Amino acid sequence: MLFTFFDPIEYAAKTVNKNAPTIPMTDIFRNYKDYFKRALAGYRLRTYYIKGSPRPEELANAIYGNPQLYWVLLMCNDNYDPYYGWITSQEAAYQASIQKYKNVGGDQIVYHVNENGEKFYNLISYDDNPYVWYDKGDKARKYPQYEGALAAVDTYEAAVLENEKLRQIKIIAKSDINSFMNDLIRIMEKSYGNDK
């Protein structure tokens, strides 16, 4: 709906072929986020906790009764990557982690955490004093970075933890979606032809 509101633009892929023909293309170069923010100014986003790992289209259908409103969920959360930026199943998170770290080995420590949940990257301790942590590059052990117990977080656990953060999102309330869409269309109609 959003990308079909404006007329297509003429586009020639000159970087691929300097003699490329001009073809009509969806106008993806507009600042749709600006229209969205202007329409959103009159609404309060709600916090929503995703159960399971539905795709944006499935969740839009569950919340609004319309899978085509998936882009509302993405834009409310400044998410422009519905594959890596959206919650996945735990298995998919593992597989993405394997792919991400395939060139460095899958069983790597990504970071350590203390009892307060603070993250510490690139640290190592030694057997003679396991509660003193140094940067991996500090081979002479001159500059301790942390003293105390730290728990290692490997690539798989880090992937699951990052994935779980995506469970909490912002949404426009179901009761507001129709008036929001009307406001958004009105804003786009006013700017039609004025912001090219």
Curated annotation (Swiss-Prot):
Induction: Expressed in the late phase of the viral replicative cycle. The keyword Transport does not apply. One of its GO terms (biological process) is viral tail assembly. The keyword Isomerase does not apply. It is found in: Virion. Keywords: Late protein, Viral baseplate protein, Viral release from host cell, Viral tail assembly, Viral tail protein, Virion. One of its GO terms (cellular component) is virus tail, baseplate. Pfam families: Phage_gp53. Part of the baseplate macromolecular complex which consists of gp5, gp5.4, gp27 (central spike complex); gp6, gp25, gp53 (inner baseplate); gp7, gp8 (intermediate baseplate); gp9, gp10, gp11, gp12 (peripheral); gp48 and gp54 (proximal region of the tail tube). Interacts with gp25 and with the (gp6)2-gp7 heterotrimeric molecule. Baseplate protein that is located next to the tail tube (inner baseplate). Involved in the tail assembly. Involved in the tail assembly. This is Baseplate wedge protein gp53.
